């Protein structure tokens, strides 16, 4: 099955956000390095940039929104899961043209690609609680 340009943008954004989180480099450095070094064919590049920059810009607000729904301390959440949650929370809160069910489904699908065996269930549970808290259900 062909992956949509937006799905590819989300997958690339998760990878770039993870790199930003681990490396502590600026979002500009991470973005430049990522688009230079990775195959960006089939990626909605403007949406990738919007997701990456928006998530980093609003990361504190996003973490505050997510915190009540986590079942453990933030630093105990798997870094990949945390990255997917941040990206999905950004989309839920700031990309209002994307239906909330699409955001949740995309978070689940990206978790199936990058997360551990049960990551998609964890992501689904949190996003399902977060969406109504953000007025998206």
UniProtKB/Swiss-Prot annotation:
It holds the Pfam family NusB. Gene3D superfamilies: NusB-like. CDD domains: Terminator_NusB. Keywords: RNA-binding, Transcription, Transcription antitermination, Transcription regulation. One of its GO terms (molecular function) is RNA binding. One of its GO terms (biological process) is DNA-templated transcription termination. InterPro entries: NusB-like_sf, NusB_fam, NusB_RsmB_TIM44. One of its GO terms (cellular component) is cytosol. HAMAP family: NusB. Belongs to the NusB family. Involved in transcription antitermination. Required for transcription of ribosomal RNA (rRNA) genes. Binds specifically to the boxA antiterminator sequence of the ribosomal RNA (rrn) operons. This is Transcription antitermination protein NusB.
